[in-house]
């Protein structure tokens, strides 16, 4: 077949990719509006699809379970689900758009060593993926998610690895969202590592800029994230006082 490998990969993954894009759009809508009941209905719909016995339906179901658990605080996925997800990602020799999307939307719950192996491999191959225009922003988003995840887990050396990768992305001026989230994440790093109070002000400025751009639902997500970070630190400080 006279077709470049990237186009061939897209042809093979077309159906899976389009179905996942539709699913992720619904997941994002539920997350941004905090629609837990809507996400539960989405999970039921995906579990019904699992009867088709296609591997990707099972992987899609795991993704919804992970995001629903994060949204609701109730338990939906287990170690077997994570093992199945990990086995799938390691088992695919050439990642296409589908695998990139699955990884970047589940990397925060993978075991840290597994996540780092997969993320480093993705970074190592990022020049290949960046040749496909649609994947450039996907790679950037994956790196941003990985950077923030490492900071949250206080894996600061690993976080610096992703910061270095992100600095090589050279976000163009129109990529405002990526620039703002990178700036937010850099200040999150400063706050988590050094307790820098000025970093809190800078993170709030980033959220303010997102609001100014009219992305109010997105701003609420980051407001919730910052509130959670500050709340956890406050609880730890209170526990320290008790002892």
Language model features: what each stretch is:
Residues 13-18, 52-61, 95-101, 133-142, ...:
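Alpha-solenoid helical repeat architecture
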Residues 27-38, 70, 74, 107, ...:
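Hydrophobic/aromatic side-chain positions at a characteristic register within alpha-helices
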Residues 36-42, 78, 115-116, 156-160, ...:
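Solenoid-repeat scaffolds in large eukaryotic assemblies
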Residues 43-48, 84-90, 123-130, 161-172, ...:
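Amphipathic alpha-helical segments of tetratricopeptide repeats
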Residues 44-152:
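Mid-protein regulatory/catalytic core that forms ligand/cofactor-binding pockets
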Residues 148-153, 161-201, 205, 210:
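Extended alpha-helical scaffolding segments
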Residues 195-243:
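C-terminal non-catalytic interaction modules
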């Amino acid at each position: 077949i006279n077709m470049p490998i990237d186009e061939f990969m897209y042809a093979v993954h077309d159906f899976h990719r389009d179905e996942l894009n539709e699913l992720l759009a619904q997941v994002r809508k539920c997350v941004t509006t905090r629609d837990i009941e809507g996400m539960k209905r989405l999970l039921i719909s995906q579990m019904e699809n699992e009867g088709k016995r296609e591997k990707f339906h099972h992987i899609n179901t795991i993704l919804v379970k992970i995001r629903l658990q994060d949204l609701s605080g109730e338990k939906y996925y287990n170690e077997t689900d994570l093992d199945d997800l990990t086995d799938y990602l390691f088992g695919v020799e050439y990642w296409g758009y589908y695998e990139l999307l699955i990884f970047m939307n589940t990397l925060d719950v993978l075991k840290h060593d597994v996540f780092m192996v997969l993320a480093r491999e993705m970074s190592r191959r990022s020049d290949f993926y960046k040749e496909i225009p649609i994947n450039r922003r996907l790679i950037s988003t994956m790196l941003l998610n990985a950077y923030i995840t490492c900071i949250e887990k206080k894996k600061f050396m690993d976080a610096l690895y992703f910061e270095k990768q992100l600095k090589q992305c050279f976000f163009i001026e129109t990529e405002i969202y990526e620039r703002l989230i990178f700036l937010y994440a850099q200040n999150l790093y400063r706050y988590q590592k050094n307790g820098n109070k000025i970093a809190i002000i800078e993170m709030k400025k980033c959220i303010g800029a997102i609001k100014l751009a009219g992305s109010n639902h997105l701003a609420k997500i980051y407001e919730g994230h910052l509130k959670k970070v500050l709340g956890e630190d406050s609880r730890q400080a209170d526990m320290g006082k008790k002892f």
